[in-house]
Design a protein with these regions (language model features):
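Extracytoplasmic "Venus flytrap"
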Residues: 29, 34-58, 74-79
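A bilobed periplasmic-binding-protein/Venus flytrap-type ligand-binding module shared by bacterial periplasmic
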Residues: 120-131, 233-247
Length: 277
């Protein structure tokens, strides 16, 4: 298996993103036509999706005659701008709600190509070990990004701890939508990456799936799993103009192939992942 890896420096790519933002990424010159390309460059943020792609998808693409290059990023905006500009062909790291948020913010036109297996967000106990131990004033952390905060609130509603007004756009959600909090839960949004390290300091936390895996938590210890809405299932992201290209269709077919599904379901590394319908 031949995979070329490039670590993309945040400083350099951030400067690019800022320049695109200033003039509108959507207003830049379109990338050269890449309809018949045989080398596919895919970007990843830290998380489980790169391993899944390299071990489960790349062999299929190579059998189809493609060479694959990997670029590693650490920023969700930069990696999307890189797709829009054509610096990379695709990224695999986000759900459509976040993708649309970045599209609107950056003035770009990326699209979801195919849903991929995605780990559930889950509720974990910190100082408390069961749902029954919830008490007046219990402390709960949720992700601080609006869309993932909304997912956290959905779990808290599913276990009967709160109620809130549904929103049409999860990217607008904040704690002000809560309408009923009978336990007077002290709900605090915090950075995703801090949820597992801070778990010992709070009673409960709703933790995003990739941070569950990266933080060494076990889904068997989760107190509740989200009923994952489709819009929060991660996707392969490409430029809208590339959706029908042969290389994009090859990626889509690989993710839908029986070989890949067998790879995921037989691999303990991907326990807790939801398969696309």
């Amino acid at each position: 298996m031949k995979i070329t890896r490039v670590l993309t420096a945040v400083a350099a790519t951030s400067a690019l993103a800022l320049s695109l933002t200033a003039c509108g990424a959507g207003g830049t010159a379109a990338p050269e036509d890449n309809t018949d390309k045989k080398t596919i460059t895919v970007g990843f943020n830290p998380g489980p999706y790169q391993q899944m792609f390299e071990e489960g998808i790349v062999p299929i693409l190579e059998e189809d005659g493609f060479e694959v290059k990997i670029e590693e990023f650490t920023d969700g905006i930069v990696i999307n701008v890189a797709v829009a500009q054509g610096d990379i062909d695709a990224n695999i790291m986000q759900h459509p709600v976040y993708m649309e948020f970045v599209n609107a913010q950056e003035g770009i036109d990326n699209a979801g190509l195919v849903q991929i297996p995605t780990p559930n967000m889950a509720l974990f106990g910190g100082k408390k070990s069961t749902l029954d131990e919830v008490a007046d004033g219990s402390t709960v952390t949720v992700p601080d990004s609006p869309a993932n905060l909304y997912r956290g609130l959905l779990i808290l509603r599913e276990v009967g701890w709160i109620d809130f007004e549904d929103v049409d756009d999860p990217n607008t959600a904040d704690l002000s939508i809560i309408t009923d909090n009978p336990h007077n839960l002290q709900i605090t949004p915090i950075e995703n990456a801090q949820q597992v390290p801070s778990l010992q300091d709070v009673d409960y936390s709703t933790v995003q799936g990739n941070f569950i895996l990266a933080g060494g938590l076990d889904y068997a210890d989760a107190l509740a799993l989200e009923n994952q809405p489709t819009e929060f299932s991660n996707v392969v992201t490409v430029r809208s103009a590339d959706l029908e290209t042969p290389w994009a269709k090859a990626i889509e077919a690989a993710y839908k192939s029986p070989e890949f599904i067998e790879f995921v379901t037989s691999n303990d590394d991907f326990d807790g992942f939801n398969l696309p319908e």
